[in-house]
From Swiss-Prot:
Subunit structure: Homodimer. Interacts with actin, TJP1, CGN and CDH1.
Pfam (any one): CH_2
Source organism, top-level taxon: Eukaryota
Name the UniProt record assigns to this protein: Sperm flagellar protein 1
One MF term in the entry's GO annotations: actin binding
Function: Microtubule-associated protein involved in the stabilization of microtubules along the axis of migration during radial intercalation. Promotes the establishment and stabilization of an axis of microtubules required for the active migration of cells into the outer epithelium. Microtubule-associated protein that promotes microtubule bundling and stabilizes microtubules against depolymerization in response to cold shock.
Region called Disordered, residue ranges: 118-177
Keyword set, alphabetical order: Actin-binding, Cell membrane, Cell projection, Cilium, Cilium biogenesis/degradation, Cytoplasm, Cytoskeleton, Flagellum, Membrane, Microtubule
Length: 236
């Protein structure tokens, strides 16, 4: 499948991945990214509050890999107006060579685009609106069952529209964006969400600290047990 992506695009992708600090070494993209965990880490690197890493379990089993990808698709990629079809998720989970690259390349574009819009100071209402007129971007390897594909103009795989945009009355979004009370409500909701996320992060840190203490205690118990066994053998 990697044949549908030009060498320069792959080279740029590998350089990009190498510059992102991840929890485990990157030796083989098809295998390393197959469980979705590193993809979640990549997104978290750009938008830390968008991803909760405890939801993604490093896995070798196909079932757990698909579970990770399904959760990532539903809870995170959807916020980026991006989606990975089930058949593609399965191929990635099975470590099919060259498939994950066809997802990572457009995902990188979407992440950098959103980051650029944030730096330019575009408001949250505009951020939530897809720029291409669709509800989300769909990335695939085949054109069957979902209609004809739309080739990426840069030759980096295939991008396909997953569904038609929801029709909206003309001027409706502009009226909402200019309504001070609506903007205030959005700002308040965003503050509440941030406060909730911070609380969750504090609790997660406490849980990790307790898990670390428990691990240290287990190591200490094993060490004492080993010494006790050695002492008993010497007495015999």
């Amino acid at each position: 499948m990697a044949g549908s992506v030009d060498e320069e695009a792959l080279h740029q992708l590998y350089l990009w991945v190498d510059n992102i600090p991840l929890s485990r070494p990157k030796r083989n993209l098809s295998r390393d990214f197959s469980d979705g965990v590193l993809v979640a880490e990549v997104i978290k690197f750009y938008f830390p509050k968008m991803v909760e890493m405890h939801n993604y379990v490093p896995a070798n089993s196909l079932q757990q890999k698909l579970s990770n990808w399904s959760h990532l698709n539903r809870k995170v990629l959807n916020k980026l107006n991006f989606s990975v079809p089930e058949d593609v998720m399965r191929k990635i989970a099975q470590c099919a060579p060259g498939v994950v690259e066809l997802v990572l390349i457009p995902l990188r574009q979407r992440l950098e685009e959103r980051q650029r819009r944030r730096k330019q100071g575009i408001g949250s209402l505009q951020e939530l609106a897809p720029q291409d007129g669709t509800d989300y971007m769909d990335v695939g390897l085949s054109q069957k069952a979902r209609g004809e594909g739309v080739p990426d103009p840069q030759g980096r795989g295939q991008l396909r529209e997953g569904r038609l945009p929801v029709p909206r009355p003309p001027g409706d979004s502009q009226a909402l964006q200019s309504d001070p009370s609506f903007i205030l409500q959005i700002a308040e909701k965003e503050q509440e969400l941030l406060a909730s996320q911070e609380t969750v992060q504090v609790l997660q840190m406490k849980v990790r600290r307790l898990e670390h203490l428990l691990q240290l205690k287990n190591v200490r118990i094993e060490d004492l047990s080993r010494r006790l066994q050695q002492a008993e053998r010497k007495q015999r």
